[in-house]
């Protein structure tokens, strides 16, 4: 699988892949990463990347011809995602679905975002990562890549670790407790559930499901109501 990131600030993207799981996955060629500087596709000799808004208003928007040129430079087949606050919220089911694609292109917004024609002409999907505003789409793109890459075979050392994670079964992950002895009196005042250490895997599984539902009801009542059974 390949990810292509189109951004005005490539230097914000690469450092995320210099450590840990995703670095190892790249080194093993489990996925490819391409980062393109949008300014390189500006028709302006000074590589101007933005324009004022028709009708007035504060801020600038990205040059739609620059975005178009950049997208044309990326080979097909590709699935193009624009990162924008106006997009639909990205969910775990989206990560699982997109992990089946061969090539995902992520276009990072800046300033006041995109000319609407860029979205109409270039986007297969538009996503946001929450109901808040960031200075650019790079963090959103990194979130999507991280979430999608976890579902690529071989990226995680233990594929089973995906099964019990939050949102995999529509509920938040059950509480976890370290298998260790601690000196801290405060930590020891809060014992882990005894059932966790008894070795009865069927009972542990049921307890974790029950705790998962309780945690979801407490932290994310919206999710709990959607999937209550």
UniProtKB/Swiss-Prot annotation:
Give the EC number: 2.1.1.228
**What top-level branch of life does the organism fall under?**
Bacteria
A GO BP entry is: tRNA N1-guanine methylation
Q: Which reaction does it catalyse?
A: guanosine(37) in tRNA + S-adenosyl-L-methionine = N(1)-methylguanosine(37) in tRNA + S-adenosyl-L-homocysteine + H(+)
Q: What is this protein called?
A: tRNA (guanine-N(1)-)-methyltransferase
- Output the CDD domains linked to this UniProt entry: TrmD-like
- What's the encoding gene here? trmD
Give the UniProt entry's GO cellular component terms.
Answer: cytosol
Keyword terms, alphabetized: Cytoplasm, Methyltransferase, S-adenosyl-L-methionine, Transferase, tRNA processing
Q: Where in the cell is it found?
A: Cytoplasm
**Primary location:** cytoplasm
Summarize subunit and interaction data from the UniProt record for this chain: Homodimer.
Q: Which GO terms describe its molecular function?
A: tRNA (guanine(37)-N1)-methyltransferase activity
| Similarity remark | Belongs to the RNA methyltransferase TrmD family.
Is the keyword Transferase assigned to this protein?
yes
Q: What does this protein do?
A: Specifically methylates guanosine-37 in various tRNAs.
Q: Which residues of this UniProt protein bind S-adenosyl-L-methionine?
A: 109, 129-134
Enzyme class, top EC level, equals transferase
């Amino acid at each position: 699988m390949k990810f292509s990131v189109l951004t005005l600030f490539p230097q914000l993207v690469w450092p995320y892949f210099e450590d840990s799981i995703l670095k190892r996955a790249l080194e093993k060629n489990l996925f490819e990463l391409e980062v393109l500087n949008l300014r390189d596709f500006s028709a302006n000799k000074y590589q101007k990347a933005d324009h004022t808004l028709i009708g007035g208003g504060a801020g600038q928007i990205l040059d739609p011809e620059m975005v178009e040129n950049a997208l044309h430079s990326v080979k097909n087949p590709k699935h193009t995602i624009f990162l924008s606050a106006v997009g639909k919220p990205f969910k775990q089911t989206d990560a699982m679905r997109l992990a089946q694609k061969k090539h995902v292109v992520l276009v990072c917004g800046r300033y006041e975002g995109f000319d609407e024609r860029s979205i109409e002409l270039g986007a297969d999907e538009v996503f946001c990562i929450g109901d808040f505003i960031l200075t650019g789409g790079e963090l959103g793109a990194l979130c999507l890549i991280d979430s999608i890459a976890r579902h690529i075979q071989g990226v995680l050392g233990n594929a089973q670790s995906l099964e019990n994670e939050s949102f995999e079964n529509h509920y938040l992950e059950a509480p976890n407790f370290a298998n260790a002895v601690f000196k801290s009196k405060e930590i020891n005042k809060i014992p882990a559930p005894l059932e966790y250490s008894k070795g009865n895997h069927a009972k542990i599984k049921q307890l974790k499901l029950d705790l998962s539902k309780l945690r979801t009801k407490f932290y994310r009542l919206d999710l709990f109501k959607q999937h209550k059974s």
